[in-house]
Amino acid sequence: MGTARIAPGLALLLCCPVLSSAYALVDADDVMTKEEQIFLLHRAQAQCGKRLKEVLQRPADIMESDKGWTSASTSGKPRKDKASGKLYPESEEDKEAPTDSRYRGRPCLPEWDHILCWPLGAPQGEVVAVPCPDYIYDFNHKGHAYRRCDRNGSWELVPGHNRTWANYSECVQFLTNETREREVFDRLGMIYTVGYSMSLASLTVAVLILAYFRRLHCTRNYIHMHLFLSFMLRAVSIFVKDAVLYSGATLDEAERLTEEELRAIAQAPPPPATAAAGYAGCRVAVTFFLYFLATNYYWILVEGLYLHSLIFMAFFSEKKYLWGFTVFGWGLPAVFVAVWVSVRATLANTGCWDLSSGNKKWIIQVPILASIVLHFILFINIVRVLATKLRETNAGRCDTRQQYRKLLKSTLVLMPLFGVHYIVFMATPYTEVSGTLWQVQMHYEMLFNSFQGFFVAIIYCFCNGEVQAEIKKSWSRWTLALDFKRKARSGSSSYSYGPMVSHTSVTNVGPRVGLGLPLSPRLLPTATTNGHPQLPGHAKPGTPALETLETTPPATAAPKDDGFLNGSCSGLDEEASGPEQPPALLQEEWETVM
């Protein structure tokens, strides 16, 4: 009872961080292209233009601000830039200003310099600090850009040059020193490329195995095959998306956008028609990636719902629920992805569509979030049932360590199936592309996200006893067939025992029993007649060997499998006709998990 009361509270506590950082999870695989950077820069320019228009339409506010700004003159002393430490001589206006009075100057008007939207500037050499814009991917978003406003209400110029002075050194530090950052990204790319490749290969083999053996065709394995296929399509869509995005100019290339290039881009934007045509392939790739990403989450949820139904439903019709699970896993993600595509194409048809566009991202993120929360709650509840079952089976025994080991093993087996690793760093959103915590988080997520399909294929296919039994049986049949073919190529043989000569082909030396397969002579018992060995392919009428073979009843054939109890899928697709079948179904699930 104590465990039952604690589990809901624990699930609620662990699910709260999931709701608080959904954006970080779903956008983890996005990349920034040069075209997307251009789009963000133009959008920032448009927003700045609106703000400038609002400010310029209120001259009274500027004059009121003008009255409040005063600064003391420091004639005869050079000024030092607070940001860069460079010394600049005083202007002639500052030298002429009286030293025994306070001078009221005009503020510098806000303006767009093709990178930043500068606010009103205080006069008399005051340095204006503005945070580095977050819409420029390569900038250091913790730094600041600096400008200085003179007493005439003009932004200070660079000495000897006819352009406004600005200090972007803190913002562009990632552009000038990116060797270590590139090593981190290259390592992350290698990790998830290897992981998704191994997952794709192992899942392909697993699907072929489950599809080839007819005795493995059952609802449980059909659901496994759908889950495997969703992992495979997710991996393929990621590879395709990366190929499309990286085929053009991206911000992960060696040549990055410099400050001058950003200004040139903002001054001469590309034609909208050309930009839209160039985004077609990218948008299709991103759309399929988001769809297969969503289907993967929902088939993980289907696995949890299926196992949960076997545990808590007394009468569970698997055939009927399989169709519902199929529609749920493939159809529901198609609905909200189609809605998202329609909204993006209608209201925000800009960029490559892998960027968030206001609140429209929640059309996809909320359903994915809901699936993560649900299958984590199912995981907690199933682990609770496992703990209860182990406690009941271990009642009266003193070895509690074995009980805990079984529970730990069962939990570890269920973790990759339910994607429990998703919630480890859910409370840590992507706020910066640097730092030790960010590197730990990215390595963890890239490792487990890419290798999750590989772990699922190993646990639920290659380590499954039923699958191993079918493979061993097929291997035995294949080696037996090779043995007969090898002996058949040796031709007919003559065997002489006393007055009788038997010319027998080796392909007919054994009777067909059991599963209808021919048996090798060395596998059959050798009978004797009058002290002479009796060949399997020849026996005198009335001999014990012949009588034994002739009177062998059909009941000696392989017994019919009875479903989960014997580790087979036969009989799983029948409707539940009595209270005995659900425990049989559940027994196989316990064998897989335990």
From Swiss-Prot:
Residues 29-188, 245-295, 341-361, 427-440 are extracellular. Glycans are attached at residues 152, 162, 167, 177. Its main location: membrane. It is found in: Cell membrane. N-glycosylated. Gene3D superfamilies: GPCR, family 2, extracellular hormone receptor domain, Rhodopsin 7-helix transmembrane proteins. InterPro entries: GPCR_2, GPCR_2-like_7TM, GPCR_2_extracell_dom_sf, GPCR_2_extracellular_dom, GPCR_2_parathyroid_rcpt, GPCR_2_secretin-like, GPCR_2_secretin-like_CS. The keyword Transmembrane applies. The keyword Transmembrane helix applies. One of its GO terms (cellular component) is plasma membrane. The chain crosses the membrane at residues 189-209, 224-244, 296-316, 320-340, 362-382, 406-426, 441-461. Residues 66-102, 525-594 are annotated as: Disordered. PANTHER family: PARATHYROID HORMONE_PARATHYROID HORMONE-RELATED PEPTIDE RECEPTOR, PDF RECEPTOR-LIKE PROTEIN-RELATED. Belongs to the G-protein coupled receptor 2 family. G-protein-coupled receptor for parathyroid hormone (PTH) and for parathyroid hormone-related peptide (PTHLH). Ligand binding causes a conformation change that triggers signaling via guanine nucleotide-binding proteins (G proteins) and modulates the activity of downstream effectors, such as adenylate cyclase (cAMP). PTH1R is coupled to G(s) G alpha proteins and mediates activation of adenylate cyclase activity. PTHLH dissociates from PTH1R more rapidly than PTH; as consequence, the cAMP response induced by PTHLH decays faster than the response induced by PTH. This is Parathyroid hormone/parathyroid hormone-related peptide receptor. It comes from Pongo abelii (Sumatran orangutan). The gene is PTH1R.
